Amino acid sequence: MLYQLYETQRALMAPFADFAEATAKLYKHPLSPFTHIPGAQRLAAAFELAHRLGMDYEKPEFNIKTVSSGGVEVAVQEQVAIDKPFCRLVRFKRFTDDAATLERMRAQPTVLVVAPLSGHHATLLRDTVRSLLQDHKVYITDWTDARMVPVEAGPFHLDDYVRYVQEFIRHIGADVHVISVCQPTVPVLAAVSLMASAGEPTPLSLTMMGGPIDARKSPTAVNNLAMNRSYEWFENNVIYRVPQNYPGAQRQVYPGFLQHTGFVAMNPDRHASSHYDYFLDLVRGDEDSAEAHRKFYDEYNAVLDLPAEYYLDTIKTVFQDFALVNGTWEVDGRLVRPQDIEDSALLTVEGELDDISGAGQTRAAHGLCTSIPATRQFHYDVPGAGHYGIFSGRRWRELVYPQVRDFIARFEKERMGDRAVTPAVKAQATRAVKKAKAIVPTVPPSTEVKAVTPAKKVRRTATRVAPAGAGVPVAAAAPRARKTARRTAIETNADDATTKG
């Protein structure tokens, strides 16, 4: 019933939002006589703010048309590699007539970005993709709004998410570097673990950013809500059926508008101040700041519904049972064993001020992946970065991306030196070794991350934590960045970043 009430309210607000937009133009258009009346600028600003507060936000576009590759502008085109009911695998294909540039781009690493299915669209990672395209061939998971998926397509569970990731990795090939941002760190680690257990080739590297691998560490408000409420509470209070005016009518979902309300409720003062600053920017005529506000909230306010089965599975598996770290998670009757991963390098990234995934939650992956050599495990704490700052905005571009780029390049270079060993031969050898050796016991959640951290106490600083015996650091530590203004808590400005991919 709540979903129907929301849709009714949205339909009633639409005419008022349109009226506010038209009135704002009336008071600010240079040819309008109302522009010259006293207070016209303030009236225009007030009506424009009212319009943005009442309007409906559609899914944005990636809108990455061209990027710079080695100083050469190349065209970028989105191509759908795989189209499934709940997700599209999108490739950002780069084109150029410059032979040298084309040859160089062909030799660049391939990256699969697994976007979160947690309320926002994959376009939230636009800045991530734009940066990666400078040095990589890029794919991304573009999750479908559940209200747009007909009931006939069937349910979508967390286990289905794991299968989707496996299918995408197999489609691209094992010579891929996987980057998971926030929520997908858990299913991605599960997907790769199951592939390793089956003797399949695994990705060259795994980069996990701000995800709840072990949600018990430094629990945040998000974690506490999931842990302190029962499974039945979520099932009875946040799951609703899609109204009849959508293709997915009668599908049970966790509505995006509820998730958005939760996002805003975490920092209400910050959002209120941001909107007031937007009003003042319009009054002053500061169009650059006003446009930055629009770009950010066009993305932030565009949300999608989550399949109910997937949402409830995530609550139980990740935040209540902690099945991954406890070694009890099974997918299709097979135990998820991160300790079986041997060939993939691992980089974890955490934000100093992350209020969604707390300190140590992502880093916990190192304590689970005990078969990855110490020299292939890395961790990076991003100074002054909140949750969104680790994958978007200035801190992502200046601090995090150089770390990720050099990490990928290091193990891509290692692959190039090992080309004589084909994936099939490596997989066959791996299966033979697994049959010959004893099963490695599951690592307890409390295990120290000795492969990643030195003996002294780890401090959350900008310096990358190098593994014991590591050689050249992944990337030089960047200077501590100044804290941004409250309106740019999530830095999503598509300013001067150029990409290729």
What is the role of each PLM region?
Residues M1-A45, A174, A191-E309:
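Alpha/beta-hydrolase-fold enzymes
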Residues E61-S68, V72-V149:
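Short, surface-exposed "cap/lid" segments of acyl-processing enzymes
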Residues M148-P150, D160-H177, L189-S193:
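Conserved acidic catalytic loop of the alpha/beta-hydrolase fold
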Residues I341-E342, L347-E350, D354:
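Short beta-strand/loop motif that positions the catalytic acidic residue
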Residues D355-Q361, P373:
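Conserved alpha/beta-hydrolase "acid-adjacent" motif
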Residues C369-H387:
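Catalytic histidine neighborhood in serine/cysteine hydrolases
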Residues V382-E398:
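Catalytic histidine-centered segment of alpha/beta-hydrolase-like enzymes
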Residues E414-G501:
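Intrinsically disordered, polybasic Lys/Arg-rich low-complexity tracts
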